[in-house]
Amino acid sequence: MRRNMGFGLVALALAVAGLVYYLVRPLSVEPSPAEFHCYDLDDGVYAPLETPGQAFGIGLAYAGHIRETASEFNPDGIPPVFTKSPQATVRTDADLRLPTPDALFDAADAIEPGLGDTLRSDFPNLSPLLDYEVEMGFVLLEDIDPSQLNDPTFSPKLGFFIANDVSARSLAILGEGKPNRYDYWGASKSLPGFMPLADKAWTPETAEPNGIPCVEIETIVNGEVRQHQSTEDLIYTPLQMLRFIHAEFPEVALDEGTVVLSGTPGGVAMTTPRWLVRLGNLFGLSRLKKLSAKLGADTSRFLRVGDRVTARGQGLGKVTVTVVP
């Protein structure tokens, strides 16, 4: 009997050790920055940035943001790619209206009919969990033929600028476990005022393969620096991002004036310990349970009415918005 008890204790210890390893194990592959040609900002010109005809976003493009959101990384896969509504564009000193629960319910219904009614019942006072994301964006200065994207030496003509990829995280969470998960991301980033863009874009005199302005970008909320990172730490080049967009949206033409937001560094309000995410997945928590857990946790770093938010980049200008009711 003692021998059986001993075997049982050993089995229990092994099971606990296995669970702990599952919860805290590191990423199988650590993300690393791409290799860039760093432009000299003195060798270029500034031009007005027009409101885009179409806009895309790339997610999880900095290692720090992958870690803080407990996301996975596949170096051979395509990162999150989503569309943003051009109608969400605003400029510096604009008011950023905090979405009401009804606005969130309507946005949820637009992407998944009936979801809004579920949210009205379960979360009548739903918070948007409003978040900030400083990003270096780029605009296409010419139409791009998809066949050009397969040439590693292709140097698309781009203009670079600063943007704030504002997000309603409560909507994004609802995509958990859905095959079209990143459509929910796009919806969460396309509410009115959710794409503050700088007024001007910087363009190099000569386009170089994998060329970008290697500059420091940051988000400041009420005078506090929340994000600060060099664009040189991006995991993907603009050419790779355009390939990803074409792979996910092959029917969409990459026309002149298209805007791409290249991803945000670490420091956003939406952070989750990796072990907690894995534990939730282990127990099969539904997306609504995950949303409830996030709403019940500390939400003090999410944006509130009265907050003044500036996204800026060295040599690329800035865009400031104020959250209003």
Predicted regions and their residues:
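Hydrophobic alpha-helical membrane-insertion segments, chiefly the h-region
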Residues: 14-23
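N-terminal Sec-pathway targeting helices
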Residues: 1-13
